[in-house]
Design a protein with these regions (language model features):
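PLP-dependent amino-acid enzyme catalytic core
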Residues: 1-268
Length: 268
């Protein structure tokens, strides 16, 4: 139920963790501007943390995503610039460029190993404490890859046989098949293979692909049947978890409800 985090998504975790690590290591100082390329949730989360800590925040986003994501970052006082169309590739290039300039710090969520560390050392451990039995499989959508790789690593430390499955839209299975297409599951499959996945692809045991329309239908069902108001990626995650549980005959499968539904009113 990571949609219940401050800022409304799972990304609140890495935002706090990465910014505080940067402070401790002297990479981020008073008066600096944090700059991040994001399809929305990490930008929202880092804008929230920047507001609390008194940093300026610049979010670089592609066009074509929900306007609520833009509005939330601005509500926290961040500047938002739109670069490119739907995929974050161009925004990422600009983020890397600015991150080298004096007075800027770029966490670089898609490449930074701190992303994996937070999910392994914190989120993964929290989930393990709540599980009634050892996890047999974790499935997570790949935005940065930090969540599914990090949590999978934590799970394999207590059950070497646990499997890690990566979720992608069936219209844009970038990692598994090299395809880059538009889709409606915002927050995953951003149009390229993240550095985290390039380094840790050997830790992925399998892939599952869910269509955008299935995901949105499931999102609506979750709200109407369970009273849980989440976004399309949560619908995709639940379908994937149920499918893998049945196909592989497993008892304990873990997945994530990543963000709140308020960002996707047009889809409801």
């Amino acid at each position: 139920m990571e949609y219940l985090n401050p800022s409304g998504s799972i990304k609140a975790r890495i935002a706090k963790y990465m910014i505080e690590r940067a402070e401790k290591e002297g990479l981020l100082k008073a008066g600096d501007t944090i700059v991040e390329a994001s399809s929305g949730n990490t930008g929202n989360a880092m804008s929230m943390v920047a507001a609390v800590k008194g940093y300026k925040m610049l979010v670089l986003m592609p066009t074509g995503l929900s306007q609520e994501r833009v509005a939330i970052s601005k509500a926290f006082g961040a500047e938002v610039k739109t670069i490119g169309d739907f995929h974050v590739n161009e925004a990422l290039e600009e983020c890397r460029r600015l991150g080298k300039e004096p007075g800027y710090f770029a966490p670089q969520q898609f490449d930074n190993e701190w992303n994996v560390n937070e999910n392994s050392d914190w989120l993964g451990q929290e989930i393990l404490k709540e599980l009634p039995s050892k996890p047999q499989l974790v499935v997570g959508g790949v935005g940065t890859g930090g969540t599914v790789i990090g949590v999978g690593r934590a799970f394999k430390a207590v059950n070497a046989g646990c499997k890690t499955y990566a979720l992608e839209p069936s219209e844009s299975c970038t990692i598994a098949c090299g395809e880059v297409q538009k889709h409606l599951i915002e927050g995953i499959s951003d149009g390229f293979v993240p550095g985290i996945i390039e380094r840790h692809k050997n830790e992925i045991d399998g892939f599952v692909h869910i269509h955008s329309h299935e995901s949105i239908d499931e999102m609506r069902r979750i709200a109407k049947e369970y009273g849980i108001f989440v976004g399309p990626s949560s619908g995709a995650h639940l379908i994937a978890a149920k499918r893998l549980k049945q196909e592989l005959n497993l008892e304990t499968v873990v997945t994530f409800f990543c963000d709140e539904g308020e960002k996707y009113m047009k889809d409801y």
